[in-house]
């Protein structure tokens, strides 16, 4: 009887670990702790202000899907990044011409120094919020795991509020 209970416990643990593992593996089988962040929700506040509400992903980061010059791009909010930063592939999808890009702007990151090219997004839409003429940095794909929504983008909102598991961006 004890052997059966032990086998049941091991089987249950294996199923739980398999489920948790599936939550952190992307469609190509690579480890990806940011696989399934909750989608942004959009609310209207008591004074008519529009709010974008982001729920923290499993790793504590905030993600959203934006439209950069009409192209869908997934961003991670990064208050340690001075600028909205696009990977080269995301910049190309957004229609940014990189033929004459000069990667001469140094940035210090957690992974060391990286050089970026400056560019401008004509528009970035997050739900019904529109940011126009946004300065961005473009970084080679192999130097950045995904596009970042930095402080210059956050500062375009009238108000922002952060708790441990929610980020609210407000437009009046």
Each model region followed by its residue ranges:
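Pepsin/retropepsin-fold aspartyl endopeptidases
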Residues: 1-74, 79-172
């Amino acid at each position: 009887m004890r052997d059966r209970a032990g086998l049941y416990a091991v089987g249950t643990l294996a199923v739980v670990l398999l489920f948790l593992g599936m939550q952190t593996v992307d469609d190509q089988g690579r480890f990806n702790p940011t696989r399934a962040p909750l989608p942004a929700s959009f609310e209207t506040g008591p004074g008519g202000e529009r709010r974008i509400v982001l729920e923290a992903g499993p790793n504590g980061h905030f993600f959203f899907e934006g439209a950069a010059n009409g192209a869908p791009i997934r961003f991670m909010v990064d208050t340690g990044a001075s600028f909205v930063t696009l990977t080269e592939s995301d910049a190309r999808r957004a229609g940014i011409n990189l033929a004459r890009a000069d990667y001469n702007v140094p940035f210090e990151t957690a992974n060391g120094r990286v050089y970026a090219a400056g560019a401008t997004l004509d528009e970035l839409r997050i739900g019904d919020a529109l940011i126009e003429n946004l300065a961005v940095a473009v970084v080679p794909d192999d130097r950045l795991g995904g596009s970042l929504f930095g402080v210059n983008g956050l500062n375009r909102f009238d108000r922002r509020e952060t708790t441990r598991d929610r980020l609210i961006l407000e437009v009046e």
